[in-house]
């Protein structure tokens, strides 16, 4: 399958003896994930996405679980622990011109207007007020607010971000 996939959840440990597994969504709501349509799974030992069929997603209190079709015991379910759940990138909503998916920022090189390197984006922190790029360069880590005031340019095709930021901020 040559489609580009986006990870939307990760499978955790088994939950019940009937093969139910913990599901850790990478979105704010399970409803958002369900709206994407067909889900695909990538087992930890492979790099192949396979379509899921007949799975059930259950929400109990603030926890989410997945029951995979034809998996009826915890021992069989264990091979799915740490598997990724994804959807084809085309299933995601189109973004406005000034919007990006966080996953597209991961791996971007970050330099300032003086061409000083902050390394690459390894994570994004959601603070409530704004997002913060977590950049790593060698043994140093830099936190750069992801707001228009500091982002000079982004070229996600070439994975480059230019910021108006200094080492000592």
From Swiss-Prot:
SUPFAM superfamilies per record: PRC-barrel domain, Translation proteins
InterPro entries: PRC_barrel-like_sf, PRC_RimM, RimM, RimM_N, RimM_N_sf, Transl_B-barrel_sf
GO BP terms, alphabetized: ribosomal small subunit biogenesis; rRNA processing
Chaperone keyword on record: yes
Comment field on protein domains: The PRC barrel domain binds ribosomal protein uS19.
Subunit structure comment from the entry: Binds ribosomal protein uS19.
The name this protein goes by in its record: Ribosome maturation factor RimM
Organism, as annotated: Francisella tularensis subsp. novicida (strain U112)
